[in-house]
Amino acid sequence: MNGNKVFLTGTDNNAVLLDDSNYINNKGANLYRPDTYLEAVEYYRLAAAMGNVHSISNLGYCYLYGRGIEANLSLALAYFRIAANKGDVDAAYKLGDVYGNDKWGIKDQEMSIYYYRMAASFVIGTEWEKGYVVAYCTELQKYPSLCYALGRELSLGGDMYTDIDRAYQFLKHAEKGYKTELANGNEMYATSYQGVIKLIADSQFDDIREQYDEFFDYDD
C-alpha cells in the first residue's frame, strides 16, 4: 500500500486465484481502522465481487458510517439488504437497528422488528418463537447486540409481543457475548453492556432470574 493506492500482495493474488474470498475479507477486516479505512474498503469490494457475503455486509457499514468512502444511507441499506437476503446475521441485525433508530430519519418499528426476527432465524431457525429454549443456543453469544435488541423488544414496553422468559434468555446471551468482546479489548461495547446489565436487573425478571442465572453462570 502506498498513500491511497492499494497494491495486492502475492498472497492476495493467490487468494483471488484460489477463490479464497474469506482471506480477502479478513484482510479488509484487519485494515478496518481510521488510518486504513480506504484500504479496507478496497479489500471488501474485491471480496464482495468474489461473492463473499460478509464483505457485502461490511461495505454496508462503510457506507453507513462513511468509513473510507462518503457516507450514503441508500447504498448502505442496499448492501445490507443484499447480504441479509443471502443469510448474513449482522446485515439483518443492522437493518433492524437502522430502522429502529431516529438517527437515520427512516424510523419504522415494524420494519425494525421484521429484520431482528430475520437475523434471529439465521442463527436459531425459523421456529424460535414457537417454544424453542433460546438458552441452549450459545451461538447467539457471537451476536450480543442482536440478543440485546431482542431481549429489549420482548420485555415489557417493547415492540414485540411480551415474553419475559425468552427476553431474559436473550439478555443473558447478550451479557455473556459483551463480556467476551470487552475481554478482547473491544471497548466500544461498554455502553451496551451496561444497558444489558441494567435491564437484566429489572424487577420484571425476578420470578425467573434464579432459574436462568444458574444455567448461564454454570461455565463462568
Task: Please place each PLM-identified region on the residue numbering.
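Alpha-helical segment of the N-proximal tetratricopeptide repeat
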Residues: 3-4, 10, 14-39, 46
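TPR/TPR-like alpha-solenoid repeats
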Residues: 30, 62, 98, 153, ...
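Short coil/turn and helix-start
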Residues: 30-35, 49, 67-71, 85, ...
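Terminal, low-structured helical/coil segments at or just beyond the last alpha-helical repeat
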Residues: 178-220
